Amino acid sequence: MKKFIKELSDKILDGYVINEEEAFKIINIEENDEDTIEVLLQYSNDIRKKFAGNKADLCSIMNGKSGRCSEDCKYCAQSAHYNTNVCEYALINYEDVLERAKEVQAQGIHRFSLVTSGRGIESDEELESLIKIYSGLKRDTNLKLCASHGIINYDQAMRLKESGISMYHHNVETSERYYGDICTTHTYEDRVNTINDIKEAGLDLCCGGILGLGEKREDRVKMAFEIRGLGVKSVPLNVLNPIKGTPLGENPLLVPNEILKTMALFRFVIPDSYIRYAGGRIALGDKQHKGFSGGVNAALTGNYLTTVGSNVDNDKDMITCSGLEI
């Protein structure tokens, strides 16, 4: 297997595009095969160096509207379908957003995104409020601005772009085949339609998914290739943090090597992208640093939407100790 990984890596470094059959061989490396996974991480890092350079990208998010979501995503604390005791509030005011954005900027983080619960932007009034917030952030900070507001259309994407947004975040979450098992109130196609509208509007796209939803290894491979087919260059990979009260609240955590192996696989499939640590990476325990020396070159840092996240200074130390620049 080590010989296969080396030969495949050498081919990718020469411009070869990996196929699904080869990816299945990688994803099926046993999680307790430490030596082979170490080799995989080493070659994943070589691919990152050649195609994505040595600069790491840091982003941070703020929960701009919480709870009462109409959608039934089985992993989500903010769905109104489940009793999770999540804090609920309407869209927050600009002063609170600006205060958080300035904290993020002072920490040396590159990107900042407001994230709101709900199927999408729920009214023209909400859109106008968001535009005022982003226009203000564009004026009052030097941050690169991102947005994450669910399913939107082309016109809404254009308005957000005009207000100062450069990137929109919209995950596929899992493979097309498995999507109906985690959400029934909208479809995988709905998500892809939003992604296409975002791209047509000229916004950069941040699109990844969640590992540990009960999917098969095959679904992780399928998701990687589906994301590659969408032309994505920023791929946030979350690890399920089971939330009590949701249908997936008792799901077992993925073991660290399964997570690291999957992130390395995404580097093999999409060599020139930002592979981004996102929520739930606490499941890696003391192996978090291995991702940064195994192909990961971006991170969502600080707190997440409804869970405690990572320490910014610790993330910076891990990144620089892995040979990446911030």
Question: For the regions a protein language model found, what residue spans apply to each?
Answer:
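Conserved, mostly hydrophobic/aromatic
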Residues: G15, S44, C73, H170, ...
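Charged helix-capping and loop-helix junction motifs
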Residues: L127-K132, T187-E189, R220-A224, L254-I259
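Flexible, acidic/Gly-rich N-terminal and inter-domain linker regions that tether
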Residues: M1-E71
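Core AdoMet radical
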Residues: H81-R100, V104-I195, D204-G208, K233-N238
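Conserved strand-turn element in the central/C-terminal portion of the radical SAM core barrel
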Residues: F112, R119-E122, T194-E218, L237-P252, ...
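N-terminal pre-triad scaffold of radical SAM enzymes
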Residues: V39-Y82, Y89-S113
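Catalytic cores of alpha/beta
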Residues: N153-K161, G214-E226, I282-G294
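Auxiliary Fe-S-binding modules of radical SAM enzymes
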Residues: M1-N32, R228-I326
